[in-house]
Regions:
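Outer-envelope beta-barrel architecture signal
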Residues: 21-30, 69-75, 139-141, 181, ...
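Transmembrane beta-strands of outer-membrane beta-barrel pores
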Residues: 32-38, 68-70, 79-83, 138-140, ...
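Transmembrane beta-strand segments that form the barrel wall of outer-membrane beta-barrel proteins
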Residues: 34, 167-169, 195-203, 218-220, ...
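Surface-exposed strand-loop-strand hairpins of Gram-negative outer-membrane beta-barrel proteins
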Residues: 35-57
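Residues that define the transmembrane beta-barrel architecture of outer-membrane proteins
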Residues: 52-60, 125-130, 137, 177-181, ...
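Residues on the lipid-exposed face of transmembrane beta-strands in outer-membrane beta-barrel proteins
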Residues: 60-66, 131-137, 183-187, 218-222, ...
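Outer membrane beta-barrel
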Residues: 64-194, 200, 222
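Detector for outer-membrane/organellar transmembrane beta-barrel domains
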Residues: 253-327
Length: 327
């Protein structure tokens, strides 16, 4: 039996072993997935990987939690395996990755909670803690510290307001976002509006937790004129970001949108999206239609998508490498 089938067989047995009385165990999952991708002639990924890639994934997640009065604890343990073509990531002349790694690592996160078991050009296996946080929930206040996930913005596919760790727009599995090490706070007002704030600390390439690697953000979510709106003020990697967004009903459909302004190297950069969604139940089944337009102000104006051209645009390259942008 090859290593990949042996690992899959082990994953299949783990829920049986974990189904006993394990203190704090609050469920989990096993997911197996095959992903085939093809890249058009003008894609930067085609020069990297070729016309097509094929990958297999296995993901085990065990969720642990506990609470006492207003305090709580969460820890999610993961084992992730990947076999296929997308592991052999290209680097430039300085050893810089042109794409974020396909398997998660904690090289730049504040805490290193990932253990790489196997890593080569055809297979990878890691175990890690994707959630590890303590929290307090009051009548109008929520506080959490540790590894966790936060989602902001009104995008359904793309999301310029979600710059902490957004999903890849082409992601097949969007049940869990990768956790980031942060302090999160929320204060609920009597009107139903709320304030949310985050402080995310990361490390640089030397392993130092510096101010240049931080994200500090404050967002207000309010209601008015039969609509909801968001106001955002943030500093992300020493760049200021202002954002405005909202949603409103449009007949039986929902109209959403976000606009962000970023004080980048060469001046202010605007990114925006607007989407429309409509849901109904044909023959008793749920169905949804989504239309979304996204404008990436950091994108290239020309259709030259070679790695060399992308790396020449430092604002774009840094966001691609950090996993903030994917296109």
């Amino acid at each position: 039996m090859t290593r990949a089938p042996r690992f899959l067989a082990l994953l299949a047995l783990l829920p049986v072993a974990a189904s006993g009385a394990i203190p704090g165990l609050d469920g989990g999952h096993i997911k197996l997935r095959w992903l085939g991708s093809s890249y058009p002639d003008d894609s930067a990924y085609r020069e990297v990987f070729g016309q097509q890639t094929s990958d297999e994934y296995a993901d085990l997640r065990l969720k642990f939690s506990g609470s006492r009065e207003r305090f709580g604890f969460q820890a999610d343990y993961q084992v992730i395996g990947q076999w296929g073509d997308s592991l052999d990531l290209p680097v430039d002349a300085n050893g810089l990755l042109l794409l974020p790694p396909s398997l998660p690592n904690d090289d730049r996160r504040w805490w290193d909670l990932t253990d790489t078991i196997s890593d080569n050009s055809s297979q990878g296996l890691v175990q890690r803690l994707d959630r590890l946080n303590v929290g307090y929930s009051g009548e109008s206040t929520v506080l959490r510290f540790g590894r966790q996930a936060v989602s902001w913005g009104n995008g359904l596919i793309f999301n310029p307001m979600d710059f902490f760790n957004p999903f890849n727009p082409a992601a097949v599995d969007t049940e869990y976002k990768l956790g980031e090490d942060m302090f999160y706070g929320q204060y609920l007002l009597g009107s139903g509006s709320d304030w949310q704030g985050v402080f995310v600390q990361r490390r640089d390439e030397e392993g130092r937790a510096t101010s240049e690697q931080r994200t500090t953000a404050l967002k207000f979510h309010g209601f008015g004129l039969e609509a909801e709106y968001d106001l955002l003020l943030a500093e992300n990697f020493n760049e200021f970001i202002f954002g405005v967004g909202g949603l409103a009903n449009l007949g039986e459909a929902v109209l959403r949108g976000d606009i962000t302004l970023t004080d980048a190297r060469d001046g202010w950069v605007t990114s925006a999206l607007v989407n429309w969604s409509w849901s109904w139940e044909p023959a008793g089944y749920n169905a949804t239609v989504v239309l979304e337009y996204y404008y990436n102000g950091f994108g290239l104006a020309e259709d030259d998508y070679t790695p060399e051209r992308i790396l020449a645009d430092k604002d774009l390259a840094e966001r691609l490498q950090r996993g903030e942008l994917y296109t």
